[in-house]
């Protein structure tokens, strides 16, 4: 049975070329010490909404589960009060 020895050089090169390899994510709300996410803070909420109007998942943004639930509720409240659009078809 033959074993293939892998070089560290090839491993590093593969990680740089891999499109799924990203830098370590962190929770912006934990770093800032936020206790409650406000639905009136539209600039922050827009950072967590994609181009098509969908809420970006926590696995992509790095947001903790506690803050992701608050963020979800805040975005839905802002949409209900017409502060944010539901879809990307409602551009200003």
From Swiss-Prot:
This protein's GO cellular component annotations are: cytosolic small ribosomal subunit
Q: Which UniProt keywords apply?
A: Ribonucleoprotein, Ribosomal protein, RNA-binding, rRNA-binding
A Pfam family this chain is assigned to: Ribosomal_S18
The alphabetized list of GO BP terms reads: translation
GO MF annotation: an example? small ribosomal subunit rRNA binding
Entry's transmembrane regions: none
Q: Which Gene3D superfamilies does the UniProt entry name for this protein? A: Ribosomal protein S18
Q: What does this protein do?
A: Binds as a heterodimer with protein bS6 to the central domain of the 16S rRNA, where it helps stabilize the platform of the 30S subunit.
User: Which PANTHER family does the record cross-reference, listed alphabetically?
Assistant: 30S RIBOSOMAL PROTEIN S18, SMALL RIBOSOMAL SUBUNIT PROTEIN BS18M
Q: Subunit arrangement? A: Part of the 30S ribosomal subunit. Forms a tight heterodimer with protein bS6.
State the family it belongs to.
Belongs to the bacterial ribosomal protein bS18 family.
- Provide the protein name: Small ribosomal subunit protein bS18
Gene name tied to this protein: rpsR
């Amino acid at each position: 049975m033959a074993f293939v020895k892998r070089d560290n050089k090839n491993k590093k090169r593969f990680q740089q070329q891999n499109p799924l390899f990203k830098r370590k994510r962190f929770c912006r709300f934990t770093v800032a010490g936020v206790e409650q996410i406000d639905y009136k803070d539209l600039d922050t909420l827009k950072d967590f909404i994609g181009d098509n109007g969908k809420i970006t998942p926590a696995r992509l943004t790095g947001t903790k589960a506690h803050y992701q639930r608050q963020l979800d509720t805040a975005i839905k409240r802002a949409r209900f009060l017409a502060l944010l659009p539901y879809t990307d078809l409602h551009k200003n």
